[in-house]
């Protein structure tokens, strides 16, 4: 995407290089430390990638189904790490098959390859969308990028897939079905893009996605057997109960449910509030589609809506927010003053970095609703999206009057 204006900070290659250098240094340090401390130890720092590696190791041992049983998974995690942690495994079997292959490598190497390659994929997707404004996107998303590097989570992968899907969809390519199908690893994050494919009647892309999903479901069935699906469904039911009981770290979740539940509302009421919010988010998306929003605004709307569909959304899933920002940053900068840009950046960092900062400052134990810190990520994120939408209304009006220097985007 090319644009007829520039911004010294948002297009600064020096800032981009500095941010990515910090991420690379953190990645290298973590990979080395995880490899050096691979032996079980009660003093070990355990992150999300350890859960990937333990689930994959169980798969290598022919016990993939045990990963979905919380009691067996906790025993395995303590055996392999030396630390008793609460990290239920609820990923679909296709991702279990993936981490099984990953676990064939040494821990540090597996972590380094997974995080390094998915980060590169994510940055590539952002670059293709934002163009010269990539530095601004990376600066705004720095808390999420550093968090995802440290934890070894898959936010870069899902964010990159959604970004590549939206690019291919805007170019009317059937290959949009490839990233759509690969989102089978986290189907709750694919609701928005699947809905967009459906209303746009992109049948070829949906056919490609269906073929990929069928293959992705068949492979773990062949490798692990049909029993893997029974174990998976049992694990999902169990994790739903854990979510209702408040056993997950709600303060690191971005959903409306997490905020409502952490304030003391009952699970049923919190789920009802979240469900209403999710329907409203999808309704706004459909409204934007019916009003024929410009493609880049519609793409950003999909990303925003996706963040509020599932009650089980963590801070590392906010990589999707970066994709949405990449689509609108040029217009946002053009239609906002410097003071507004600083305020929006502060809100970006507050909304995306709250869980990370809280974990470091308070180091809370996961002991249940009412004892953990409040989940305060959804409110600033909703405010951020609302403020960006208001600013972008100025862009829409300017485009309609023919005064915007933004180059046209291919129609959906």
List each model region and its residues.
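Primarily membrane-embedded glycan-assembly and transfer machineries that use lipid-linked glycans
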Residues: 1-176, 197-322, 329, 371, ...
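Residue-level signal for cytosolic alpha-helical hairpin/rod architecture
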Residues: 95, 191-192
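Long, hydrophobic, well-ordered secondary-structure blocks that form the structural core
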Residues: 143, 183-185, 193
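Transmembrane beta-strand segments that form the barrel wall of outer-membrane beta-barrel proteins
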Residues: 178-182
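Membrane-embedded alpha-helical segments of transport systems
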Residues: 185-188, 215-219, 343, 347-354
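Short, well-ordered alpha-helical microsegments
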Residues: 190-191, 317
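Aromatic-enriched
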Residues: 330-412
């Amino acid at each position: 995407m090319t644009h007829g204006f520039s911004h010294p900070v948002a297009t600064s290659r020096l800032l981009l290089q500095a941010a990515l250098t910090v991420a690379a240094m953190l990645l290298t340090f973590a990979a080395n430390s995880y490899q050096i401390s691979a032996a079980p130890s009660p003093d070990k720092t355990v992150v999300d990638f350890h859960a990937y590696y333990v689930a994959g190791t169980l798969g290598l041992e022919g016990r993939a189904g045990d990963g979905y049983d919380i009691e067996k998974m906790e025993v395995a995690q303590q055996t392999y790490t030396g630390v008793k942690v609460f990290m239920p495994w609820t990923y679909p079997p296709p991702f279990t098959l993936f981490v099984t292959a990953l676990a064939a490598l040494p821990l540090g190497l597996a972590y380094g390859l997974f995080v390094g390659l998915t980060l590169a994929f994510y940055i590539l997707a952002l670059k293709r969308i934002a163009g010269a404004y990539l530095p601004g996107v990376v600066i705004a998303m720095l808390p999420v990028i550093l968090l995802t590097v440290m934890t070894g989570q898959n936010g870069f992968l899902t964010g990159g897939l959604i970004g590549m899907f939206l690019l291919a969809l805007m170019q009317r390519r059937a290959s949009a079905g490839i990233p759509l199908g690969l989102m089978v690893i986290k189907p709750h994050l694919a609701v928005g893009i699947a809905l967009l494919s459906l209303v746009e009647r992109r049948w070829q892309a949906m056919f490609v996605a269906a073929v990929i999903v069928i293959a992705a479901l068949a492979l773990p069935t062949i490798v692990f057997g049909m029993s893997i699906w029974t174990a998976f469904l049992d694990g999902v039911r169990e994790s739903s109960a854990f979510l209702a009981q408040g056993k997950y770290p709600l303060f690191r979740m971005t959903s409306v449910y997490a905020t409502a539940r952490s304030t003391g509302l009952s699970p049923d009421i919190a789920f009802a509030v979240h469900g209403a919010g999710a329907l409203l988010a999808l309704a706004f998306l459909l409204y934007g589609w019916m009003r024929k929003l410009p493609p880049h605004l519609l793409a950003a709307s999909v990303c925003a809506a996706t963040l509020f569909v599932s009650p089980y959304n963590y801070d590392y899933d906010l990589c999707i927010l970066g994709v949405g920002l990449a689509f609108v940053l040029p217009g946002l900068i053009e239609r906002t003053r410097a003071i507004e840009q600083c305020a929006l950046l502060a809100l970006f960092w507050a909304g995306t970095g709250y869980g990370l900062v809280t974990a470091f400052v308070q180091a809370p134990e996961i002991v249940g609703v009412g004892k953990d810190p409040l989940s305060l990520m959804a409110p600033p994120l909703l405010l951020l999206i609302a403020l960006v939408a208001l600013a972008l209304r100025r862009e829409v009006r300017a485009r309609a009057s023919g005064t915007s220097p933004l180059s046209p985007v291919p129609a959906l």
